[in-house]
Amino acid sequence: MKKLKVLSVLGTRPEVIKLAPVFNEFFRQRGEILSCVVFTGQHQDMATVLLRQFGITPQYNLKIMRRNQSLADIVSRSVSRLSRIIVREKPHCVMVQGDTSTAFIAGLCAYYHKIPLAHVEAGLRTFDKNNPFPEEIHRRFISLLADFHFAPTPRAARNLAAEGIVKKSIYVTGNTVIDSLRVLESQSGTRKLPCFLTREVLSKKIILVTIHRRESFGQPLREVCTAIDRIVRLPEVEVVFPVHRNPQVRTQVRRLLRPRSNLHLVEPLEYKAFIDVMKHSYLVLTDSGGVQEEAPVFGKPVLVLRQISERPEGLDAGVSCLVERKAAAIVGCVRHLLDSPAAYKRMSRSRSLYGDGRAAERITAVLLRHKTMLQRKRNEKGKNMMPQVPEVSMSIVNNSNSMIRAETGSTV
């Protein structure tokens, strides 16, 4: 029987991390699934490193990243290029992950071409359209367009049902990030720790800091840096801060913080190294969604530097808490966890709130269960849903595997 062709679109570091297990499962089922991967290059440098680490070779790279690009720039450069690829590849299904501009654009293109859309990590909500911006609106729009909603938790599934999404299209699978963590854990014995994790550093209480969201830019980031400057004065503490490459983060951090013996301002870490640092940390300060999912697996308290979170499961379980982005509030919460063994014990219970490591297996099983329907749908509507557009100019990069990469410029 003909294989099910799934065209997956990704462009950022989190998308690579969370789709890698699905691609592995597709490979395991390669007798039934033909996987085509499109990389938009939304986070060209950071995501490209991860693609190599996970052994993912995209068939197409749109290379859309530009310095100081706006959201409108990302959308305008991506839509026509991705549309042409969909016309060329004629997939049975398009798959996206999360709530990035890449996911939103791919969902829109799939809808325009009447291709069924599978949404991994569906149903996350803050119910505030501006927080996070623009992710909250992206994921709401994607939910309107999707045909398969792979919710990471029962709460996310309930959010979708409350919005009128057909219940039979909602599947609680767990979050694929837990799948990735399980794989990394199985390999942990063969890895060296990052060089800055010396014996002296490991003997202290390591605080891992990550910050990158748009709503953190400006005054909130200044407050975070002020808090860090106060925290590193504590002799028992080591702060590890992988500084995001976004100029609005990097410029401000470099201006406000100076390296000290116990303050490690480092380049963004490879994912494996980042997880190793997290495992050796005492607690985590972050505005990241993914870190809120990862840290509880290792029993690391998470102080969430945001006003609201679309991952309330950690808040309800008591392993994470929202902290106002004010220096005094941040320092106060850190000191409380440093000084109160009881408070730390309550927040440092190891919990796998977001899955059991089998999400990719469940996602693949659902798609294969609908294989005949998806193939029939394309065959019935194929000619009508494939508008005529100029042919895409390609160059072969791997003849043995028929890998095709899109050239930059106007060709895609």
Where are these regions (language model features)?
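Nucleotide-activated sugar donor-binding and catalytic core shared by glycosyltransferases
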Residues: 1-241, 246-399, 403-408, 412
